[in-house]
Amino acid sequence: MNLLQYTFFQHALLGSLLASIACGIIGTYIVTRRLVFISGGITHASFGGIGLGLFAGISPILSAAVFSVLSAFGVEWLSRRKDMREDSAIAVFWTLGMALGIMFSFLSPGFAPDLSAYLFGNILTINQTDLWMLGILALLLTGFFYLFIRPIVYIAFDREFARSQKIPVEIFEYLLMMFIALTIVACLRMVGIVLAISLLTIPQMTANLFTYSFKKIIWLSIGIGFLGCLGGLFISYPVSYTHLRAHETDSYL
């Protein structure tokens, strides 16, 4: 069966490519700057925005984006305080987001929402709106890193040296935290909260085994991430198809 004839599969392929580009770019900064734990905190904090959106009757993705960006700024601000440890600030927003998400989800009017769609995602259900969101984000990240690759590399490896070069480190760090939050939210419907952090770290860690160049890690991460998504799509199809046929046979018998 030719899978490429189906619109949902075409969307899945294009979404995989766009998500790999966005995650490959910002994920390289995350791994180099050692922000993996912070990114995990923002990922789980986004659940609070999802619950708030379900409760208020607005788009969960929109509310998750706002909540995630504010959480990212909050973590960045608290981590700069001398009386607050960075890991403690992350834990605050991590637990707060999950708690609010669960509470608002079950308080939302009507039927209980299906949270598995946001926790685990479903790459075959992404639509044109999701693709536009991923495409715009990938374009913004590409342009931002193309224009400011040098100060970003300086900040990723040595913030004090970056300050000595008159680079506005704080502004860049807040902007990059915003991009991290938006990338996480853009990938929620595709891979979910549980696996979003994987696209932001595993391809980059794998690429780092072969090169130490920041730019090369970005390119390799995009390729590795896209191949991983393709592998998951083409491997899962025959497994799902076999399971479906077995279920149909059992039902017939």
Residue ranges and their predicted role:
Residues 1-21:
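Membrane-interfacial amphipathic/re-entrant helices at transmembrane-helix boundaries
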Residues 6-11, 82, 90-147:
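Transmembrane helix-bundle core of multi-pass membrane transporters
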Residues 13-17, 61-66, 91-92, 131-136, ...:
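Hydrophobic alpha-helical transmembrane segments
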Residues 15, 19-23, 49, 53, ...:
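Alpha-helical transmembrane segments in multi-pass membrane proteins
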Residues 19, 130-202:
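Helix-loop-helix "hairpin" substructures at the membrane interface of multi-pass membrane proteins
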Residues 28-111, 207-219, 235-240:
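Short loop segments and helix-boundary regions at transmembrane helix junctions
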Residues 190, 194-241:
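Transmembrane alpha-helical segments in multi-pass inner-membrane proteins
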Residues 242-250:
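Conserved small/polar residues in nucleotide/adenosyl-binding loops
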